[in-house]
Amino acid sequence: MSKASGFLKEFRDFAVKGNAIDLAVGVIIGAAFGKIVDSVVKDLIMPLVNYILGGSVDFSNKFLVLSAPDGYAGPMTYADLTKAGAIVLAWGNFLTILINFILLALVVFIIVKAINAARRKEEEAPAEPAAPPEDVVVLREIRDLLKK
């Protein structure tokens, strides 16, 4: 067998194994789930925070200018300041990402907790005793007949 065909066989064995496929599915679902959490934060939670705080609070545009370039007179937006070389602490973006992470971790925790509870329930359920083999049944019948 040539090295190339051996390599291809080894790769096929790796790719077809359940663990590699499970990992690939998990990564794809995780990426999609991350987008859902991001949308929940941006489209549901942040509008509620804005409503509660009584204004238009967009944390992603909150920042602190640590050092602006000398003589800078342009717009005081995060994108323009960083483009001009300012040192900017983007605390609002960090806060938004932190909220995303906390929500994602909370949802994963709830899912894992539910799965563990289902597994415990499955383990706690007493298994029905297996039916005795046919030869044991016949021997018991013979024993019972001999007792009579």
UniProtKB/Swiss-Prot annotation:
<keyword id="KW-0406">Ion transport</keyword>
<comment type="similarity">
    <text>Belongs to the MscL family.</text>
</comment>
<dbReference type="InterPro" id="IPR036019">
    <property type="entry name" value="MscL_channel"/>
</dbReference>
<dbReference type="GO" id="GO:0005886">
    <property type="term" value="C:plasma membrane"/>
</dbReference>
<dbReference type="InterPro" id="IPR037673">
    <property type="entry name" value="MSC/AndL"/>
</dbReference>
<dbReference type="InterPro" id="IPR001185">
    <property type="entry name" value="MS_channel"/>
</dbReference>
<feature type="transmembrane region" description="Helical">
    <location>
        <begin position="45"/>
        <end position="65"/>
    </location>
</feature>
<dbReference type="Pfam" id="PF01741">
    <property type="entry name" value="MscL"/>
</dbReference>
<keyword id="KW-1133">Transmembrane helix</keyword>
<feature type="transmembrane region" description="Helical">
    <location>
        <begin position="92"/>
        <end position="112"/>
    </location>
</feature>
<keyword id="KW-0813">Transport</keyword>
<keyword id="KW-0997">Cell inner membrane</keyword>
<feature type="transmembrane region" description="Helical">
    <location>
        <begin position="21"/>
        <end position="41"/>
    </location>
</feature>
<keyword id="KW-0407">Ion channel</keyword>
<comment type="function">
    <text>Channel that opens in response to stretch forces in the membrane lipid bilayer. May participate in the regulation of osmotic pressure changes within the cell.</text>
</comment>
<keyword id="KW-0812">Transmembrane</keyword>
<dbReference type="GO" id="GO:0008381">
    <property type="term" value="F:mechanosensitive monoatomic ion channel activity"/>
</dbReference>
<comment type="subunit">
    <text>Homopentamer.</text>
</comment>
<keyword id="KW-0472">Membrane</keyword>
<protein>
    <recommendedName>
        <fullName>Large-conductance mechanosensitive channel</fullName>
    </recommendedName>
</protein>
<keyword id="KW-1003">Cell membrane</keyword>
